[in-house]
Amino acid sequence: MSSVKVYKALAFSLRTSEIASDKSISHRCAMFAMLADGTSQITNFLRAEDTMNSLKIVKNLGATIDDDGETIKISSDGIKESSEVLDCGNSGTGMRLFCGLLSSADGHFVLSGDEYLRRRPMKRITAPLRDIGAKLDGRENGDLAPLSIRGASLKAFNYESKIASAQVKSAMILAALRADGECSFSEPELSRDHTERMLKGMGAEIEVEGLITKIKPMKKLLSPLKIRVPADPSSAFFFAVAAAITPNSNVVLEGVTLNPTRIEAFKALERMGADIRYEATENIYEPIGNIHVKYAPLKAITVEDNISWLIDELPALSIAFACADGVSIVKNAQELRVKESDRISTVVNGLKACGIEVDEVHDGYSVKGGVLKEAKIDSHGDHRIAMSFIIAGVTCGMRVDDIACINTSFPNFFELLKKITKVEFTSL
């Protein structure tokens, strides 16, 4: 296990185009290329553990992959049965979306992952897929990986999801593309929409009407992707928080997706008083541009709406809460408990270790702003917890243990961090 010591930062000014490529889009690029007629061309693909696992799975499913280090070309003449266990590593997105993709494929497939992924709930995917005819099973009656899939004919469906989850929605959309009739999917609030945007751009017949997504089965293979993957706003947000809590600091985050369902955390930071400006530069399946963030004194807010739009950024946003004036409140965020760790407990315990007053409830927590103090934090193998408390360290210094998990989403995180503060690594 490795550890990092982060030192308090002085005022900094950083402009960077080196934020990690978007993880959600990279996963989808690898998978959706399997549905295309022709060769998909993907530049700036995220070369992190999670997404490279998805790329390896696609190859194991019969795709031809040509990677020159800059552009990845993927071509496929259909999904083939693999003799390998399909290893999703740490990625819940990978496992859940592959369930939807493979549920109608000809063959038998086994999906597994690391010790953390094998503890995460999968019934939210396996249950609705089983209801439409998928032959899918796993431990605890399909709730835990490894998952076994035998491709089958799928029935048309009208599914009403009880949770707002882009992973559930995406899995059902992928299943719907090969169902025996038109399908619809509804959710209690709009979740992230990369799948709809990308598949529609490839020629899939998908219509979104409020909270209802309607999908027609594919009549033919889709057009291949040609995309430069934008920077990941979830990764960019760590450095936005660093600038927002460090007096006289600013950062410009270049080439980030400005998809409204992905920048809600920036909007929350803006409501707290941070000086944030968005600069659109292009549109490739979705808007892309630069985000400018400057330090300003922060005030407390309540976060309870559109939770699925900022669920991944809440740990980092909580560091901003700890530096704000007043009590910030998080509600309706019970989904945090089934991420790579129980992120409600890990955030609460981490902030308490840093001297911050925090109260935990079943679906969230409250944070009374104060002065962060240096502490020793265990990431619990969760990349977002690790990076969030490392960013907290720019205000006071911090030691964070078990940092290898950061490679699942942001391999060059420390290269960028070194541009704003001093870090030291140790092996335990």
Swiss-Prot record:
<feature type="binding site">
    <location>
        <position position="23"/>
    </location>
    <ligand>
        <name>3-phosphoshikimate</name>
    </ligand>
</feature>
<dbReference type="InterPro" id="IPR001986">
    <property type="entry name" value="Enolpyruvate_Tfrase_dom"/>
</dbReference>
<dbReference type="GO" id="GO:0005737">
    <property type="term" value="C:cytoplasm"/>
</dbReference>
<keyword id="KW-0963">Cytoplasm</keyword>
<feature type="binding site">
    <location>
        <position position="92"/>
    </location>
    <ligand>
        <name>phosphoenolpyruvate</name>
    </ligand>
</feature>
<dbReference type="InterPro" id="IPR036968">
    <property type="entry name" value="Enolpyruvate_Tfrase_sf"/>
</dbReference>
<comment type="similarity">
    <text>Belongs to the EPSP synthase family.</text>
</comment>
<feature type="binding site">
    <location>
        <position position="23"/>
    </location>
    <ligand>
        <name>phosphoenolpyruvate</name>
    </ligand>
</feature>
<feature type="active site" description="Proton acceptor">
    <location>
        <position position="312"/>
    </location>
</feature>
<feature type="binding site">
    <location>
        <position position="343"/>
    </location>
    <ligand>
        <name>phosphoenolpyruvate</name>
    </ligand>
</feature>
<dbReference type="GO" id="GO:0009073">
    <property type="term" value="P:aromatic amino acid family biosynthetic process"/>
</dbReference>
<dbReference type="GO" id="GO:0003866">
    <property type="term" value="F:3-phosphoshikimate 1-carboxyvinyltransferase activity"/>
</dbReference>
<dbReference type="InterPro" id="IPR006264">
    <property type="entry name" value="EPSP_synthase"/>
</dbReference>
<keyword id="KW-0808">Transferase</keyword>
<feature type="binding site">
    <location>
        <position position="24"/>
    </location>
    <ligand>
        <name>3-phosphoshikimate</name>
    </ligand>
</feature>
<keyword id="KW-0028">Amino-acid biosynthesis</keyword>
<comment type="pathway">
    <text>Metabolic intermediate biosynthesis; chorismate biosynthesis; chorismate from D-erythrose 4-phosphate and phosphoenolpyruvate: step 6/7.</text>
</comment>
<feature type="binding site">
    <location>
        <position position="165"/>
    </location>
    <ligand>
        <name>3-phosphoshikimate</name>
    </ligand>
</feature>
<comment type="subunit">
    <text>Monomer.</text>
</comment>
<dbReference type="Pfam" id="PF00275">
    <property type="entry name" value="EPSP_synthase"/>
</dbReference>
<dbReference type="InterPro" id="IPR023193">
    <property type="entry name" value="EPSP_synthase_CS"/>
</dbReference>
<feature type="binding site">
    <location>
        <position position="167"/>
    </location>
    <ligand>
        <name>phosphoenolpyruvate</name>
    </ligand>
</feature>
<feature type="binding site">
    <location>
        <position position="312"/>
    </location>
    <ligand>
        <name>3-phosphoshikimate</name>
    </ligand>
</feature>
<dbReference type="GO" id="GO:0008652">
    <property type="term" value="P:amino acid biosynthetic process"/>
</dbReference>
<protein>
    <recommendedName>
        <fullName>3-phosphoshikimate 1-carboxyvinyltransferase</fullName>
        <ecNumber>2.5.1.19</ecNumber>
    </recommendedName>
</protein>
<keyword id="KW-0057">Aromatic amino acid biosynthesis</keyword>
<feature type="binding site">
    <location>
        <position position="167"/>
    </location>
    <ligand>
        <name>3-phosphoshikimate</name>
    </ligand>
</feature>
<feature type="binding site">
    <location>
        <position position="28"/>
    </location>
    <ligand>
        <name>3-phosphoshikimate</name>
    </ligand>
</feature>
<dbReference type="GO" id="GO:0009423">
    <property type="term" value="P:chorismate biosynthetic process"/>
</dbReference>
<feature type="binding site">
    <location>
        <position position="339"/>
    </location>
    <ligand>
        <name>3-phosphoshikimate</name>
    </ligand>
</feature>
<comment type="function">
    <text>Catalyzes the transfer of the enolpyruvyl moiety of phosphoenolpyruvate (PEP) to the 5-hydroxyl of shikimate-3-phosphate (S3P) to produce enolpyruvyl shikimate-3-phosphate and inorganic phosphate.</text>
</comment>
<feature type="binding site">
    <location>
        <position position="384"/>
    </location>
    <ligand>
        <name>phosphoenolpyruvate</name>
    </ligand>
</feature>
<feature type="binding site">
    <location>
        <position position="120"/>
    </location>
    <ligand>
        <name>phosphoenolpyruvate</name>
    </ligand>
</feature>
<dbReference type="InterPro" id="IPR013792">
    <property type="entry name" value="RNA3'P_cycl/enolpyr_Trfase_a/b"/>
</dbReference>
